[in-house]
UniProtKB/Swiss-Prot annotation:
It catalyses: UMP + diphosphate = 5-phospho-alpha-D-ribose 1-diphosphate + uracil. Its EC number is 2.4.2.9. The gene is upp. Pfam families: UPRTase. This is Uracil phosphoribosyltransferase. It comes from Aeromonas salmonicida (strain A449). Its cofactor is Mg(2+).
Length: 208
C-alpha cells in the first residue's frame, strides 16, 4: 500500500497547531479545512492532463486541463465533514458520497448506520476523508462498502494516522493509497491516537 506522509512545512505547522488542548472550535475547523486542502493537492498530483485550445484574451491559446477525471469525495460521518470543504476547493464539481460509521467505544468495532453513494461509482476515483485513522476499523468498513458498490480506485486522506491503523488498512486493502499529515506514535488503551488531536468530531462540531 502506498503511504504518503506529507512533510510540507505548512502541513506540519498547521497540524501542530491542531494539537493544542484548548483550541477553539472555530480554529480547529479552519485548520481541518486547510490541511484537508493541502492533502488534496498532494493526492491529486498524479492526475493526467491534456492539451485543450481555448479562446484567450488575444486569440486561441493552448492550455493544460485535467483529463476526464471523475471523482467522488466520501466523508465518513461525522468528522469527515470537517475536511470536505478543503477538498472541494480544488474540485468544486466533484460528486459527494456519504457514509455514516461510528466506533463503538466499548468494542472499538465500526457500526454502520447510513450510506448515500453516487451513481456510476465504478467510473470514479473515491477520495475517502476522515480526520483520524486509529484502529482502521471505520475506514476499512467504508472501503468494503465502496468496493461492493463497484468502486475500483480509492485514495484515503486523513489528518493523523496511527501505525496500527495503517497496518490494518494495508492488510485489508493493499491497493488503496493513504495520504496523511502525520503518522503518530500509536494508540492508547482506549484506542485513541497519541499524541493525536483528541476527539476530532467533538472539536469540529463543538460537542462533548
Amino acid at each position: 500500500m502506498k503511504v504518503v506522509e506529507v512533510k510540507h512545512p505548512l502541513v506540519k505547522h498547521k497540524i501542530g497547531l491542531m494539537r493544542e488542548g484548548d483550541i477553539s472550535t472555530k480554529r480547529f475547523r479552519e485548520l481541518a479545512k486547510e490541511v484537508g486542502s493541502l492533502l488534496t493537492y498532494e493526492a491529486t498530483s498524479d492526475f493526467e492532463t491534456e492539451k485543450v485550445t481555448i479562446d484567450g484574451w488575444n486569440g486561441p491559446v493552448e492550455v493544460d486541463q485535467i483529463k476526464g477525471k471523475k471523482v467522488t469525495v466520501v466523508p465518513i460521518l461525522r468528522a469527515g465533514l470537517g475536511m470536505m470543504d478543503g477538498v472541494l476547493e480544488h474540485m468544486p464539481s466533484a460528486r459527494v458520497s456519504v457514509v455514516g460509521i461510528y466506533r463503538d467505544e466499548e468494542t472499538l468495532q465500526p457500526v454502520p448506520y447510513f450510506e448515500k453513494i453516487v451513481s456510476n461509482i465504478e467510473e470514479r476515483l473515491a477520495l475517502v476523508i476522515d480526520p483520524m485513522l486509529a484502529t482502521g476499523g471505520s475506514m476499512i468498513a467504508t472501503i468494503d462498502l465502496l468496493k461492493k458498490k463497484g468502486c475500483q480506485s480509492i485514495k484515503v486522506l486523513v489528518l493523523v494516522a496511527a501505525p496500527e491503523g495503517i497496518k490494518a488498512l494495508e492488510a485489508a486493502h493493499p491497493d488503496v493509497e493513504l495520504y496523511c499529515a502525520s503518522v503518530d506514535q500509536g494508540l492508547n488503551e482506549k484506542g485513541y491516537i497519541v499524541p493525536g488531536l483528541g476527539d476530532a468530531g467533538d472539536k469540529i462540531f463543538g460537542t462533548k
